[in-house]
Amino acid sequence: KPVTRTLQEMGYTNITVVKEQEQPDGHFPTCPYPNPEIKEAMALGMEYARKCNADLLLATDPDCDRVGIAVKNKAGEYELLTGNQTGMLLLDYICSQRIKHGKMPADPVMIKTIVTMDMGEQIAAHYGLRTVNVLTGFKFIGEQIGKLEQLGKADSYVSGSYVRDKDGVDGAYMICEMFSYYATQGISLLDRLDELYKTYGYCLNTLHSYEFDGSAGFARMQSIMQAFRGGIKEFGGKKVVRLLDYVQGLDGLPKSDVLKFLLENNCSLVVRPSGTEPKLKIYISVSAENKEMAEKVEDEIAKTAEKWIC
């Protein structure tokens, strides 16, 4: 309802709501896992989108702190964008519009987590933004906003400093504004994404999760983390250029059991235990000339990483 109200106040009138998912239900009967980042959770919404020929599909999770989107490709099929892809599009759009309208602050800052798109830093640098990397969790981003305010730089937060945690409503607002702007230019979000890839190179970001239940699983994760600290030289043929071990509290960040391997050719791998689930998570970021090459490189990196887990 907050998203619907926001869109209506923006002037959108042709809004279709998925009736089966309109009312809260903690059993989540319409999808296996209520995460808008996965295709299964968007399946019912995509059915609705096809029936009404929607231009844009938006979906939030139950507590409305995340938002996922799907847009039509040239074949007329709905394509789900990843959070990283949406983030790159929003970063580029907001920066370009702020410059266009003379509203870019003197010392602009992009705050992102260490597991988020490496390509974002290239986009930020193009627009003159300084990048601040923080640990996973929006509380760390909110903390940085507070520090910027103390320095008199509240405007450095591109969407506003009024939200200190993940907010799907604000995300939906910005996505719709961006979508509408590009529609007036005769291009789609996928078109703009392709333009970004042509400018900065193709970027692929993936997440691999491995479950380890119980106390034995926890001990196993601790053992795996120690193994990753054992001087690994390469992943998938990509040499390790530098290892960032955040258990030492790097760059003024709190100590955290997180490792980030900076690989050659602007690739990276992050491994960390989940803070909320009995899972070990591996984030892989690959830069390549095209999608096919990126997928091949990502697969090789993932295979090497799995050897240290399985």
Over which residues does each language-model region extend?
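N-terminal small/polar loop signature for handling phosphorylated ligands or for N-terminal nucleophile
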Residues: G11-R66
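Active/binding-pocket-proximal capping segment
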Residues: E9, E20-D25, K139-I141, E277-K279
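Short, acidic/turn-prone active-site loops that include or flank metal/cofactor-
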Residues: K19-Q23, G83-G87, L135-K139
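Phosphate-binding and adjacent anionic-ligand microenvironments
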Residues: R50, A54-L56, T60, E77-E79, ...
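Gly/Ser/Thr-rich active-site loops/lids in small-molecule metabolic enzymes
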Residues: T13-V17, E77-C95, G168-M174
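Short Gly/Thr/Asp-enriched flexible loops that form oxyanion-binding sites at enzyme active sites
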Residues: V3-T4, D65-N84, G120
